[in-house]
Amino acid sequence: MGMQLSDIDLLNLDRFTEGVPHDWFTYLREHAPVYRHPEPGSPGFWVLTKHADVTLVGKDGRTFSSDQANGGVVPIEDISPANDADFGDAKLMLMTDPPEHTRKRKLVNHGFTPRMISRMEDHIRELTTELLDGTIAKGECDFVVEVAAELPLLVIAELIGVPVEDRHKIFEWSNRMVGSQDPEYLTDSDKVLEAQVEMFMYAGALAEERRKEPRDDIMTALLTAEVDGDRMSDMDFNLFFMLLSVAGNETTRNAISHGMHAFLENPDQYQALVDDPSLIDSATEEIVRWASPVMYFRRNATDDVEIRGQQIKAGDKLSIWYASANRDEEVFEDPFRFDIRRDPNPHIGFGGGGPHFCLGANLARMEIRVLFEELVRRVPRVESLGPADRLRSNFIAGIKHLPVRFHSTA
């Protein structure tokens, strides 16, 4: 007997420890691309799995709200007020709609200019070179912990002025907040809120220091930015620090981890990059498509709307699944093949445009590109020493551990 809709349970986190359930998404794209998924104690939520629909909803912030008051972007389940942090009137930028989101985004854009990001490439390459040389010399490593997690932490520390020796505080805070349903990081809601408080206190101290001693860096640019007489409040800055520390760390870490895992499973593609390093730009885009590190975002309908014949009512919850959209057979030829020459590659691994397009997309691309450029330059072959250990989450497509051996000769 074949698969049925009743077999699909996207709230079963244990299933995600085996990998992204692409068999479920393939079935949904074909048989129920807009599907009302059951949820205990609620009317359920809509699951959108097609590239076109995910893109449509992601771009229409008026009809499909990200506002925290309407449920925010994550999780699918509604959060009890007792387990939610109280930020007063301030909200994470991800959890706002225009015009508030537009205001926040304009302020933040003062720090994330192309000039600011491009200025970092030489330094990111230095950090990458030092990191890889030390790790490769050992011969074997846990690629996630020692490489994929380290580089974004080093970059974020540089970006927002965190002393290098404090970078693992970000790693710990991030794991507590994103991995709270994984046995390795398992913690209760109090610990998640504790991590938020610790991050806010740390961000506040950094901001105070930078106001006293401004520098030509992104943090100073953010704190001094002014748009239409509006400046970033202390709470806005704290929330942005948290967003950058968690989102900027987790997504890049997992894109790099999935990239390495894909190369291990497709050694011909790694060899192709060794032989022709000019493929690095298309390889970077394929890594992001393949990884889809953020599997879904949630939205809430503000109006009645119809999608593919399904009647979605105002107030209904929707989940838009990037992990599925990036394997859509109507958009990608042979979507389950990891192909570093893929062209075109209209993936939506960074959100697919719209108001919530990933602010750090260019920085993430740079980190992925530089790391694999420098890796293939040094190591002609990488060997897997064991399976990928995956995060217990239906939100972040995370790999926690990936043991590898580096071979200096092919």
Positions of the model-derived regions?
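Cytochrome P450
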Residues: 1-410
